[in-house]
Amino acid sequence: MSYILHRLTHLIKANRHLHRAVRCLLVPYRAHLDNRQRRIYDVWQRQHTEQPPALSLLAQQPRISIIVPTYNTPIPFLREMVQSVVAQSYPHWELILVDDASTNETTHQAIRDLAEDVPQLKPFFLDKNRHIAGATNYGIAQATGEYIALLDHDDILHPDALLWVAAMIDRTGAQFVYTDETKMDEHGRPYQPFFKPDWNADFLRAVNYITHFAVMSRQLLTEVGGEDGSYNGTQDWELFLRLTRALQPEQIAHVPQILYYWRVHQASTAKDLDAKPYVIDAQRRALEADSTARQVQTQVERDPQYGAQWQMSYSLGQAYSTDTASFDESTTVGQLLEATTAEMICLTQHNALSAAMLQHLATDAARPMIGAVVPRITDERQVIANLSSILQPSVVGLLQQLSRRSFTKHIYLTARYNLGIIDAPTVVVARTKLAALAPDTPLTSAQITAALCGKGYNTLYNPHVTPEEDV
């Protein structure tokens, strides 16, 4: 069914006039769905609002330099952005605005006026356009804070954004911190909240899930070299890949609070990736460079159905012997290993994997940090339920109420990412990793993934491989 829908969508998009007509017809229905989901989320948010730690309890209170490149920014958006920083409950910040040679003089004047009213605002005006990466790096060079925060010129921060981030730095000593976010429309109305997991390496290589709000150590940023202008349009994602390669997982922290409001308006990347086609090429190059830096062989392909996502196939240069066994709580890992000599073992309830599919999953199962690999699960409620290993239970409950038009739900149904303990109809595991488990471990997906996670392995969900009975 998903293939048929994909082909139908492709045919409609190929006919420009038909595509436009269908989009117009769907506007009222989409608005209805969005309003329904907004109401559900509003109720949930009122029930789950948390207060940040008290400032007085923070032993470390680092100065945070907020870098904002501007270019012909609509004045109302610019003022709202600055006001959201001024309203912060955390006092130790500076706001550095770097105007990237705006052609609209009203932008220059608005920045000067704001600087007169806000002592912590430092304006800089470039005489030549350097694009976002160049303007950001210029701002970083002027910063005096121990940490650098990235903020877009038309977005806004939650009043407690910096306090939550500072509290996380104080508690963990993290060098890189990111938060949850929500999109908002041109009128400032929030919609499409995005609930993120803690550090998730495979997720970051499928889609830039970190995006906003990102705060990083200035020393670390200096060491890795700032933003790279050759990746214009995806400079933040490329930077995040570089930063996280330089860190240990415990140095990366996630604040599970919606603290950033990403404004969607005409031609913004948040609204439509195809509005900036050069971004696509930059994303591909960033992911390929990341693979090279990690010294792994991969094939990077843009997802044909979901253009903001990427599929990364690992090539380890060998074919594996494989075998298939049924899940059985009365059978143990020790008994399984006595019955087969295969290098890769597929444990399943009923689904069949072709030889090609099994080899595809095996390349992931052979990776050092991956325990079990899970192909696509067609039961969407089960996919969302498995998120309880990486998201808060209340968020999982919320997602079960929402439709696929929820960005969070959609991304977790369609992207590759790491999980913990899960319940799945099919998993693929390397023999060497099964051999490291207690021999009396029962053959169930939950028991196997729990034991593997206990050994430090991650589970990998790969929805791009569909068992044959589910096609």
Describe each region flagged by the PLM.
Residues I148, M344-I345:
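Short aromatic/hydrophobic "clamp" motif used to bind/position activated sugar donors
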Residues A133, A141, P190-M216, N232, ...:
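A recurrent flexible, glycine/aromatic-enriched loop bordering the glycosyltransferase active site
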Residues L220, S230-I258, L287, H360, ...:
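A short, conserved alpha-helix in the catalytic core of glycosyltransferases
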Residues D99-Q109, K128, D152, S330, ...:
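A conserved acidic beta->alpha catalytic loop
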Residues D160-Y191, N351-P393, N458:
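Conserved donor NDP-sugar-binding/catalytic core segment of glycosyltransferases
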Residues A14-S84, R302-T331:
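N-proximal low-complexity "stem/linker" segments adjacent to membrane-targeting elements
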Residues Q83-H92:
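Short, acidic, metal-binding catalytic loop of nucleotide-sugar glycosyltransferases
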Residues L126-A143, E329-E338:
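Glycine-rich, basic loop-to-helix element that forms the pyrophosphate-binding segment
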